[in-house]
Structures are given as structure tokens and as C-alpha cells.
């Protein structure tokens, strides 16, 4: 899957490999992201998250979940990549930025986002090398760049390990000598290896290499490269200012021009694997109240009765398996959801007035079924009733009385509820939202390779 970025748009492009064709689905990026319609300086990918650096700062997003978080860049610092400390049990994502300080020293800042507070630490590193490109590759939490030695001009892969917070030369590249005019690209191959592409500036010929074995931060000296393919480009051909999807299958070759989807010179492409990894600390609390309501608690994903109470978010799972609902004489005042993830059942916290909860009053969701919509009513102060519509057409019992404005929360066709969030005051539920999975299009990859455009 390929990510291709274009101003304020994100487009999923479905590519049929059997009958060469594309189908485009376009969505707008949220307008509250500073610099979203400007020039994308850098676009990166890290374990399901896309990170883009504009002139105004850095955005971290999940295109499938349509979650984005924003951090302002440090003045005069250059974004170099995002990763995490792989020695810790949980992935605490970190942003690496640097600023040349002298001919032999670079200043750096590592920003960790595990809470609503952004934590930055200053560092200084001695160096006798430089980046060939600002683009990094994140693999198993570590960062890798194509770099060159200033004295010898030898090009190699430089690494940064967030667990030790150290730079280390990782391995040499197949083409040892650096030609700065050539185009080059380092990428992840088959999930755990590297691929390296280099295009000769004069001949336009392309060579692609891949590593033979899995990449680990500690085994750089053992890396072996093998040549995957060579592409000879005729002298009369020009690949400049031309965006295409090429489909090669057996002895068949097809070219689909997509210039209308990407703009020169602002197009950037990155390999991306769709994921349900949420953007870290996606609570919106660092934005204004108006923006928070617009982004989380507006249909069709969420509803807000009032802004009272404490915000909660159960997170994202694979499915919902059981629901506990509590009511008083009139209204729905308590919910608790039980989720499945990796063949395990995980119980979320209870939300609302737990004294109304009857342990025998629970909704069981049969295997193969899922919640496709949540419906109910609300007043100006709280949610009054709630029910759940299942994929197989069943409507669960209504909890609470029908009182106030009706609401219906649902995802795209084929999406299922995989998590809940909201606000509760201890007496009432004041807001409710649903994390929906991406539509099945993004999971049907046997003969299709979607492409995303920003």
C-alpha cells in the first residue's frame, strides 16, 4: 500500500490487479490542523501511524481511524523521525528533531507523548556524517537513515536507538560510494527487512536491493544485500513530473496515470500498512472546547448532551462481546462494555452511576455478529435512552425512556463498533461516542492494493 500526499485531501485508491483499474474515495483532512494545506516537508510511517511535518509543526495521525494530533515544532529544528523505546513493554512514541550546532556537533530534541504533556529533552551528539535525505525509516522502534561519511563520501545506513539514545552506523549500502545527484529510497520490505532503491541521475536506470534476513538493531554487521531487480529506462522516456501506478503481473504490464490525484511539486509517497493503532493520548484536551465537540461528539460518531462530567475512553479493540446497562426510574445512567482482542475478553471500566447496575441485566453479542449502530435520545443535560442495532438486523432492548432529541451513531457501510468513549458525571451519561472500524474495503487485500493521497 502506498501513501501519496496532496494538500488537504486523503484519498483511498483501490487498485484491481486482475482487471487494471482504480477507484478513488476522497476525504478532507480536519481544518483545525495548522499548516495542513501547506507544503508537506516530510512524511513518515511508524507502526500504523503516519507522521507529517509541515512548516508549522508535526501532525501524528491514523488515516483509517481519522485521528490526528498536533505538536508545534521547535524553532530551527528539523524533524528527523518518530519511533519508540523497544525495551519497554508499551510503545511510548517519541519524536526526534535535530539542529546542526557546529561542524562536529548536532543538537537534538526527543519529545515523548505518553500523556497530554509533551516532554522534550535536549541532547548533543558528536558526528562526522550527515543525512543524505531527511526521510527516515522506523522499524521496531529504531530510526534508520541513508547517510554518508563527510571524509570518505561512503554512504551507509545510520541508526538511532531510542532505548539507548545513541547514534550508531548500522551497515553499508550496496552502492558504497555516494553520488548526491542520484535518487534513493530506503524502505521496510515484508515487514522485517530493508529494501533500497537507487536511480541514476544521468541514465535514469533503477536498481533495487533487499536484505536477506530480518533487521535487528543489534545485527548491523551481519546484514547481507541481494539485488532484487534492475530497470533499464530508455533514453526517450521521462519519469519526471509524471505520477503513475504500474501493475506488473506475469507477462502483463499496465500503466495508470494518476496526475489528477497528486500535485507536483507537493507529492510525497510512503508505504503504509492500515492499522487500528490509535493516535497516542487522543483525548483532544489540548484543543478548545468548541473544537473538542466538533471532532469527537458530533454525529455520526458521537453525541453530546452537555459538557459536564469527566471524559473517558475505553480504547480500540477487535469487537464488543458484552454490554452492561444500568437505568434508574427514567434514564440510562450506566454503561460498561466488554471487548475481545487477540482471542481474549477485556472488560472496560464502568461509566456513570454504578449503583443502578443489575449484574443479570446484560447484552450478549453472538459470535459473527457486531454492533453497526447505537441509537437513543438525549436532553440538554444527559442521555436518556440507548439501544444497539446489530449487523444481522436485530435491535437490542431499549434502555431508558424515549425523551428528547433522537440520535443515531454509525460508521461507514460494513464498519463495526470496536470501542466506546464519552463523558459521565457519576449521575448521568452526558456524552457518548463510538470508535468504528474502517469499512471492509481496507481489509480486502488479496487482489487489491489501496493507495492513500493526502
Swiss-Prot record:
Keywords: Lectin
InterPro entries, sorted: F-box-assoc_dom_typ1, F-box-assoc_interact_dom, Jacalin-like_lectin_dom, Jacalin-like_lectin_dom_sf
Jacalin-type lectin domain mapped to chain residues: 295-438
A Pfam family the protein falls into: FBA_1
Keyword Ribonucleoprotein: no
Any one GO MF annotation of this record: carbohydrate binding
Covalent S-S links between cysteines: none
PANTHER family found in the cross-reference section: JACALIN-RELATED LECTIN 11-RELATED, JACALIN-RELATED LECTIN 3
NCBIfam families the record matches: F_box_assoc_1
Protein family membership: Belongs to the jacalin lectin family.
Record protein name field: Jacalin-related lectin 37
Source species of the chain: Arabidopsis thaliana (Mouse-ear cress)
Source species taxonomy: Eukaryota, Viridiplantae, Streptophyta, Embryophyta, Tracheophyta
Encoding gene, per UniProt annotation: JAL37
